[in-house]
Structures are given as C-alpha cells and as structure tokens.
Amino acid sequence: MSQPKKRKLESGGGGEGGEGTEEEDGAEREAALERPRRTKRERDQLYYECYSDVSVHEEMIADRVRTDAYRLGILRNWAALRGKTVLDVGAGTGILSIFCAQAGARRVYAVEASAIWQQAREVVRFNGLEDRVHVLPGPVETVELPEQVDAIVSEWMGYGLLHESMLSSVLHARTKWLKEGGLLLPASAELFIAPISDQMLEWRLGFWSQVKQHYGVDMSCLEGFATRCLMGHSEIVVQGLSGEDVLARPQRFAQLELSRAGLEQELEAGVGGRFRCSCYGSAPMHGFAIWFQVTFPGGESEKPLVLSTSPFHPATHWKQALLYLNEPVQVEQDTDVSGEITLLPSRDNPRRLRVLLRYKVGDQEEKTKDFAMED
C-alpha cells in the first residue's frame, strides 16, 4: 500500500512550516493549536480509510513505471522466491502478492489494513491463487503470521519518499517476521536534491505584467502579492518537473539500507545531509526539488533494478517534492548553492512529512525554511 496520492492527511492539530514572520501565519498556528489533536488510533484509521476507494489503487497500478519496476524486481528474483514464503506489507488490491506467486513463491501473506483487503481477496480468488496467496486483514503491527518469511515486498514510498511514514511498518515487519538474511524488495532507497527554476511558476509570477498589453489595465503592482501567495507559503508542493528545470547537478543527501539495524531510530530523528552544487547558467532560482530512487536486488544473473522518480527519467505518480524559496533568486553560471536538509515526521502527525532546509545561494546570507506536506 502506498500513500493516498490524491488525498490529504488529517493533521488534527498544530503544525510546522515557514519562517514565522507573517501575522497571518501566527494566527493560523494559534487556531491550529486550539484544535484537539487526534490520537494515533484516530490518525491511523483516517489513513487506512483513504485506501478504501478505488481511485487511489487505480492511480498506483496505472503508473507503468512503478508497476513494471515492481513486477520485474520480483520476477528477476525468482530463484530466491521459488518455493519460499513472502510477506506483502500493505498489499492493497493484491497485485504485488500475485507477482510473487507468479515468481514461484510457495506462500504469500498479503497484509492489508484498509477495507480494500476484501477486493484483494476477490482478485486473488479470481486469479485462482487462493491456495498460495492468503489475504490477512489488519495492520502489520498486529497481524500474526503462522511462520517466519523468507522475503518481504512492499510499496511503501510516499511523496518525498517518507510522507506517511509507512517505512516504519515495513521495518517492524522485518524485525518481527523476516528470517535472518531474508530478502527485502526493494532493498534500499536514496534521496536527491537540486536547485530548480520552475517554468510554470515563472509564467504565473510574470502574468500580472502581461495584463496591460491584452486589456489596457496595468496590474503589474500585483507581482509582489502573487510572489507571496505562490512562494511565501511553507507547503511541500508535489509537482512534476522536466530535466530542463534543474539548475545544477543533483546531489544525493541520504541513503537508506532497509536491512540496517537502527534505521527506525534514524527515521524518527530525521534523515538528511549536506549538499553543494554549482549552477549551469543564468536563470531565476525558485527553490529546490527532492526526489528518490529505490533499488531491487538483481537476482542471480541480473543487474540491480532501479525505480527512479528523477525529473530526468519517465514521470511517475510521485512526481517531485518542491521546496519554494520566499522569492526568486537570480543565479548565474557557477553560482554556488549549498546547505543542509532534514526529512522527519511532523510533531502533530508522524505520518505527515516535515522538511527542514538551511541553504545559501551565492553571496547571499544563509537562510532557513521549515516545510510540511499539505494537510
């Protein structure tokens, strides 16, 4: 089960974001603090309910880059899966579990916490695999399996990789149910960052200066207002870019090995790192884009398979996560861009992604900005 791509998480309480300099931001935070915070059980229930709708699963399976990568990543590991047991964490409609059965798995435990488990069971039965794929309703943290498993498969990645914190469920399953030396599909993840010039945003910011030539009314005075509205917020914007929007060589700032002990604690404390790059040429810099890739082991004779959400690769439903500066900054060839980025769970809702960004562009003073995924 992946994140509800077109749905919003409920935060149920005060949140982070921004630099705290605008009066309206302060008023909004005060109002948020007055709202009662939801309990973990309530947050989880709302999260699971998002997956009871067919649209979420349609979007995920229709993403050919995603679904083909999982199918190939599983089938290429047929030698490790043949005659073995597999746990599918967050099985959704069951397609990954069926891929595992097609690869020769003896038994697949498809664990799904949302009501869509009923449709998963129907799909399994419709494909004649009910003797090998067992759909188990409930969160993986509470479901009991009859045995340890040889492999775990899961599509746990959210926007910006870590939105919705599903990786923690996979790690719980790894610790409790995976045999020593067992297979994880995918096995690792990497995070990247790069400065960007958003062409669509640039057009929108300049729109108000173009009104006069069309209608004879000068509205260029609204450019500053448009900039505050479109860039001055603290939301992580999920949007697809092209390679042309990237202003410098992407920098990897984090790598997660899912087999690594202690990864759960790292996620709670925050995943991140430093970065430094030089701009290719002259352009308005609007912010940063972050994206990820995950890697599947190659099997006995194949190279590892990489599923990338880079703007230089075919588009996926994950797109990229954009972090806008408060206003554009003009950069030139070889302008130095550096900083530090940390991804961590929000305080009010651990499933909601928060990003802390410290950055410096050229000779400008260092700045910081606190972002959060939209509720």
UniProtKB/Swiss-Prot annotation:
GO BP term (any one): negative regulation of ubiquitin-dependent protein catabolic process
PROSITE patterns listed in its UniProt record: SAM_MT_PRMT (PS51678)
The name this protein goes by in its record: Protein arginine N-methyltransferase 6
Active-site residues (renumbered): 155, 164
Species the sequence originates in: Homo sapiens
Reaction catalysed by this enzyme: L-arginyl-[protein] + 2 S-adenosyl-L-methionine = N(omega),N(omega)-dimethyl-L-arginyl-[protein] + 2 S-adenosyl-L-homocysteine + 2 H(+)
Post-translational modification Phosphothreonine, affected residues: 21
Signal peptide start-end: none
